[in-house]
Amino acid sequence: MGFIYDWCEERLELQSIADDILSKFVPSHVNIFYCFGGIVLTCFIIQAATGFAMTLYYRPNVVEALSSVTYITNEVSFGWLVRSIHRTSSGLMVLVLLLHVSRVYLTAGFKKPRELTWISGVILAICTVSFGVTGYSLPWDQVGYWACKIVTATPEALNNVFPSLGTVFVTLLVGGTSVGQPTXTRFYQAHTFILPLVTLALLLTHFLMIRKQGISGPL
């Protein structure tokens, strides 16, 4: 093990990176309310792990989606636990995210020079809500189906301001003239591929800016 560590250290300088991370100054005013962002990240990691586990059994089509979710819950070993953790941590993630945004806003953490940190955080919040919207419909039961109908019909309101623009958005979301298999495929791809990639990129940007600028001071 020592040989492997020395080999990696010579090429990557891991110790200097670790020293830089561990020696970062933490302001004295930081308290438990500054931990909400870390809790959101923890929830995201749990979501990713449990979500990946369920993709091994989930079938993203309108005929077998509900039966595959039922199979995960009732037949797969600890499947009920994995799904319960996924659902519970998703709700907790949204709740703690609201607390995190409130804390940053109330302590003026969005002001100069941290505007870009705030903007990336807002986009991350939008991604979080999008995770919820797309994931809610994946079981393709009655609740998921009608939730999907409501969500995909909402952009039609844009037609009142920009004629035909809302219709274009609806067509992109639905994948046709009505909610069906193309819709489920789009929601599944967004939930398991597009949104995770965008979120990871934004998280990296968010944390690098926090690392560079430090934690905002007290009011």
Swiss-Prot record:
Cofactor note: Binds 2 heme b groups non-covalently with two histidine residues as axial ligands. Binds one heme group covalently by a single cysteine link with no axial amino acid ligand. This heme was named heme ci.
Membrane topology label: Multi-pass membrane protein
Binding positions (heme b 1): 100, 206
Annotated compartments: Plastid, Chloroplast thylakoid membrane
Residues the entry annotates as binding heme c: 35
InterPro entries for the chain: Cyt_b/b6_N, Cyt_B6_PetB, Cytb/b6-like_sf, Cytochrome_b_N_euk/bac, Di-haem_cyt_TM
Family annotation (CDD domains): Cytochrome_b_N
GO cellular component: chloroplast thylakoid membrane
Lyase among keywords: no
GO annotation terms (biological process): photosynthesis; respiratory electron transport chain
SUPFAM superfamilies for the chain: Transmembrane di-heme cytochromes
Co-factor(s): heme b; heme c
The entry's keywords: Chloroplast, Electron transport, Heme, Iron, Membrane, Metal-binding, Photosynthesis, Plastid, Thylakoid, Transmembrane, Transmembrane helix, Transport
GO molecular function: electron transporter, transferring electrons within cytochrome b6/f complex of photosystem II activity; metal ion binding; oxidoreductase activity
Role noted for this protein: Component of the cytochrome b6-f complex, which mediates electron transfer between photosystem II (PSII) and photosystem I (PSI), cyclic electron flow around PSI, and state transitions.
Other information: Heme 1 (or BH or b566) is high-potential and absorbs at about 566 nm, and heme 2 (or BL or b562) is low-potential and absorbs at about 562 nm.
Family in the record: Belongs to the cytochrome b family. PetB subfamily.
HAMAP family named in the record: Cytb6_f_cytb6
Subunit structure of this chain's protein: The 4 large subunits of the cytochrome b6-f complex are cytochrome b6, subunit IV (17 kDa polypeptide, PetD), cytochrome f and the Rieske protein, while the 4 small subunits are PetG, PetL, PetM and PetN. The complex functions as a dimer.
Full protein name: Cytochrome b6
Organism per entry: Amphidinium operculatum (Dinoflagellate)
Gene responsible for this protein: petB
